[in-house]
């Protein structure tokens, strides 16, 4: 049966083995168990990338990238909410830290790597300026309203929103993200299509069948689910390693966010390497918008039900780096063409973000 499937066997076997290992009673193996889970985690990430590309090829742009962004974000939100409900008061800043880490990884790390790889291989790459402008408008608004404005409101002291303000911010986030999805998929779908596909072999390749795409879609969800579960299972070991290294505990959130975003990051990297920068940017911007546009409303609902106070406002250091990232992204993408220098600058900002976490 598997031989007749137009899918590599490893993309089916590894995620299933990961699920078996996760629920099997072999945790007593200690470091060997950690190594097994880590290996299966990497394999599941690679399998997720393959299945995402199959689905994206079948449904076309921008639906393929939107599907991957939504799938990962829904699982990410589920992970955050579950940790908040079980972690108690110590997790009040979890959503903020995770969202900030995800946005910085996407804006500077993922995008910077794509621009660098594409610039080195093709010197210049083109994309649709209209789609990126729409994405940045929506992303900037949500980031300021949810991560920066809470520091300056007076209804509640500190980096917090009052319950009414939190509900209002959640509704605004949903409105902005909903308007973005409507624009991307219905009103102005052409904004998010590559400016020219004549030289793109992938654009002319035979798309997979509906059966293959459906199977890949199911396997994609299976892969993403086990990636998040394995990341959660490995979190204590990661936390111990970070503490033993003398690094701040906040670095754990960055590591987990990076693991969860690996499927999208690898898919974006491969697209840029194949001279499909539009796909890379659709993935990056769509992921950032979905991450914050869906996480904040979900966290707001949890806060209202449990009475938990949610920390949203970021500190001045993070604010400076976030605004710098947005400013550089706008300058880098304002012409519809990119080169390796812009990628290098974004990666430098990403390195600075990581460095200031370890050495604040």
Language model features: what each stretch is:
Residues 1-360:
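Hydrophobic alpha-helical segments, chiefly the membrane-spanning helices
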